[in-house]
Amino acid sequence: MKFSQASLLAACLPAISARFIETAEADNVILKPDELYLIETAPGKTQWVTEDQKWELRRNGQRFMDITDTPSLGSTRLNAQTVSFPKKCVKQDEVADLSKNLEKKNMKANLEKLTSFHTRYYKSNYGLESSDWVLEKVNQIIKDAGAQDTVYAESFPHTWQQHSVIATIPGQSNSTVVIGAHQDSINLFLPSILAAPGADDDGSGTVTIMEVFRALLNSKDVVDGKAPNTIEFHWYSAEEGGLLGSQAIFQSYEQSGRDIKAMLQQDMTGYVQKTLDAGQPESVGVITDFVDPGLTTFIKTVVEEYCNIPWVETKCGYACSDHASASKAGYPSAFVIESAFEYSDPHIHTTDDNIKYLSFDHMLEHARMTLGLVYELGFYDFSDSSEDRGDL
């Protein structure tokens, strides 16, 4: 039945689009129905599709990377080093102090603003406006922390309207720890027209890492650049289009020889109801497929140390979020989601992905985990912790 409804909506697209452009000229989206895109649905498995076919695949549960502009991502890092991660947490006192700064009210206020945009579809003017707001908010956080002399945020532009946002906290080396979330949203039943509040997907991750960024800047050592490693926070554009924004960024990093030691993606951090309805304990879902096993193991340790709820292993398939872009570029990456994948939010990609379904207490647990991870790894000495994959 879902497929029939989607097909009917797709058939009505030309007429509806014309009406939409007439009544909402402020958000014109130029449709190119015949343009082809190269997608990868599994490692090495590619096909050419139209944009409508991309959305049909997504409606039917198929994830993919759109590699039209990034066909060689990772090709120069095939013999990259394998990174070793800590065996235990050692920064408990510092993280405990910083965690006191995490505030649910900030996440709620930021999410209310983020969901006020009609959509955050990456090809729309709304998507541009929402990314402008993300950059503005991140810069305000830096200013409020008095960190402007060392910490900075900038736009990473793309060939579509919405830009990505990168905040950088320089450390004593160029070795970098990345925390990511995607800022765009989509309504898979008519992306250029219908509302897509995207509260959980991925407004929740966006504001979770935004709050972690704010809390982290309460550390004078971090702001003063005393951490051994550089720390970056990424808010990606166009994840819903096939991980487009994150691929562009990690392709740029690969080409410039950036030393990324770890990347954690936070995509959907707020929904717990299906878990509770199934009689399962509230937990965070640690993804175990298509991720770096060493980083993933350490994340479990971080959850046990800094969260009030346990972790549960789960899988989400190929290219299920932006960590896949980092992984393909040859960088260690991991993904933590709100629950076991089968209990994740059923409202996403529709007009009903709203704040009312989310738990800010649960989002706070994700924030605690993320803060613990970024502080532990930010102050970790990676210099003696790598081995060449070619020797394995």
From Swiss-Prot:
It is found in: Secreted. Residues 1-18 form the signal peptide. Binds 2 Zn(2+) ions per subunit. Glycans are attached at N174. It is an enzyme of class 3 (hydrolase). Keywords: Aminopeptidase, Disulfide bond, Glycoprotein, Hydrolase, Metal-binding, Protease, Secreted, Signal, Zinc, Zymogen. GO terms for cellular component: extracellular region. Zn(2+) 2 binds at D201, E240, H349. Belongs to the peptidase M28 family. M28E subfamily. Monomer. This is Leucine aminopeptidase 1. The gene is LAP1.
